[in-house]
């Protein structure tokens, strides 16, 4: 009898065998390099691999070059994180049956990420509920942190590193000021320590009224000297606890959240105050452009009317984070008119990986075609960074629907390289997750499922947005 066990999806797309015993050489030992070496030793079945730390004018800090000469592979990057990304890329190519065997000709692959910042936004609350989450509770067990570290924290970091995601915002944009308390900063530090070897920086969503709610001040006016001093001291405290902290994500004057407009100040004045506090530590502010403008009832125009006149007024370490469409993550929207309308202001796109308007975790909706459609109109090079609202929770398979994992995977791959096609990404995910690329019996099934994935988003558009009408769902929960 042959033992049979069910596949629970917990290994995501990282289902390769772990008994390869590959020959790997590294320049030194470190937490990050040790991970890269161990991943390759366990999974790589190809030629001997030498990892080399070396500056290269053609490589960005996280870029890498894989070169095959005769029967040896050399992997080069300026940084340890770049070598880790290269290790995962080698394993991906192996699973796709594309690389790593002896060849009569020399081969070379060069990869540079399109964006320095490739970040997940978790809309996770401190009570472990998730706004627009459909895969269980929040991964972050705040009550047990910092003393108890779940194995899933490292598994989460590993999954993100394998697809090139290098940053995470841990908490909801509708933020509790409690996240900035000394008690919670120690909890955040514990997570940052787990993520760091995988090249992942931690960021926090903040409540703009934190000086009042947490600091006992009478105002949160960004031009008030006591408010400025409070934020500078708080930022100093954060970096003393987490030296490589990334910065803040801010939802201000939107859906009831406090912001600078409450004090007759502009979004730029609010963002710049925070940016000035973060700048000595090389931190950044991601300031969301999702606002309900008081000056015009047409929602599709509101972000444009509010932000376009502020072009050129933001500090250089502020990035305006704009939803891909002008309304709110609908199954199909035109791109936001803010893209390209603020040439003197760094911008980043916010995609929604979680399926708030596309059937929760009940529906198969492969979202890479939607994001590919966006990049057909908005030049990737016009953006400074890319964010995705996460679809991850405590469900055994991480994302609820078995195919929702593909959207997490696709976001990471497209954040690294926006020129990848949704077809290619779907094929990668399927071969790593469900099918053995070397087994010809799998090919017909894989072909049919690939087609199903590629047609799924358009099907959602057809039955959720007939005649181009949007917001057709029940009140509140958006289903």
Indicate where each model-derived feature is located.
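Active-site beta-loop-alpha junctions enriched in small/polar residues
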Residues: 120, 125-127, 173-175, 207-211, ...
